[in-house]
């Protein structure tokens, strides 16, 4: 038995809105038409999906199971239509690459430039994402490859370290360490480290704090209020320090100084992708980045 993708799309809207009224408005359907679509889908599947009440709509266990598969199913269908239309128009194959703020746009561009995949036969689309968005965007096929500073891929995804970048220190131009050509991690014992996400939630934050502990001190740290911005900008307007991968020297129009960190310490760039997908282009890209 085949699934009617229109009904699946209707179901996803109901599941996400938890309301027939809001879902109908989102789909630009009448509530009666949407209700009929949901009843028809339940008949086709032979199981109830929704618990309907005056307070709204809740998913039954069967509905939760269908929703988990429906989102990537719709994304795959949309992607398939896009690929077919691009092929018909003779347009290049599209590979969508997401990256978190800790892997800067400049670093992504430098890694991609000159790869076999970067040719006129391929279109590379780069998208900036927050760390907690990356896994979901891979699962729903919004992106094909995710680049992050994580040490392991999100649950249910495959991953490979494709690069390592040297860590350095970023401080405000007026900071007491700004005149230094190089610092060591123990030099930061009295400083407040600005990180991009909370410890215990972000693997990269845990990695950076772990490096400080290995250097012999428990780091004071705080999370930047500016989410989605490059790490080098997180020291603007405060006296904190940030561990970054930018080149040494002035940054952010001279408002920030990037200082060498000794001895040399590197952090990974992890490429992640879906286990249930096959892409020769993605394989070439990952192999090229790792070489």
Summary of predicted features, one role per range:
Residues 12-30:
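Short helix-boundary/capping micro-motifs
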Residues 42-59, 64:
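A short LG(V/I)-centered, amphipathic sequence patch enriched
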Residues 44-45, 66-88:
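Alpha-helical linker/hinge and terminal dimerization helices associated
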Residues 92-154:
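Central regulatory/effector-binding core of bacterial HTH transcription factors
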Residues 155-160, 165, 225-277:
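Beta-alpha-beta core module
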Residues 159-167, 171-193, 283:
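Flexible hinge/capping segments at coil-to-helix
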Residues 181, 191-215, 281-282:
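Secondary-structure junction motif
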């Amino acid at each position: 038995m085949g699934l009617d993708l229109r009904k699946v799309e209707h179901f996803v809207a109901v599941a996400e809105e938890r309301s027939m009224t809001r879902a109908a408005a989102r789909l630009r359907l009448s509530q009666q038409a949407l209700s009929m679509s949901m009843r028809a889908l339940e008949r086709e599947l032979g199981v109830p999906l929704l618990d309907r009440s005056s307070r709204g709509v809740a998913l039954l266990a069967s509905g939760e199971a269908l929703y988990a598969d429906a989102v990537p199913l719709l994304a795959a269908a949309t992607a398939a239509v896009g690929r077919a239309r691009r092929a018909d128009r003779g347009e290049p194959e599209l590979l969508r690459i997401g990256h978190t703020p800790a892997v800067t746009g400049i670093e992504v561009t430098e890694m991609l430039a000159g790869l076999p995949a970067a040719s006129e036969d391929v279109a590379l689309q780069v998208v900036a994402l927050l760390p907690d968005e990356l896994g979901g965007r891979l699962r729903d096929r919004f992106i094909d490859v995710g680049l992050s500073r994580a040490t392991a891929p999100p649950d249910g995804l495959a991953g490979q370290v494709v690069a390592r970048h040297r860590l350095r220190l970023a401080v405000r131009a007026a900071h007491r360490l700004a005149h230094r050509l190089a610092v060591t991690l123990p030099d930061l014992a009295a400083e407040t480290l600005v990180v991009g996400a909370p410890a215990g939630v972000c693997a990269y934050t845990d990695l950076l704090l772990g490096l400080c502990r290995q250097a012999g001190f428990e780091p004071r740290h705080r999370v930047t209020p500016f989410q989605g911005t490059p790490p080098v900008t997180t020291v603007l307007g405060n006296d904190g320090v940030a561990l970054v991968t930018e080149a040494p020297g002035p940054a952010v129009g001279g408002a920030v100084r990037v200082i060498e960190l000794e001895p040399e310490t590197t952090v990974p760039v992890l490429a992640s992708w879906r286990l249930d997908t096959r892409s020769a282009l993605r394989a070439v890209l990952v192999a090229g980045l790792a070489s």
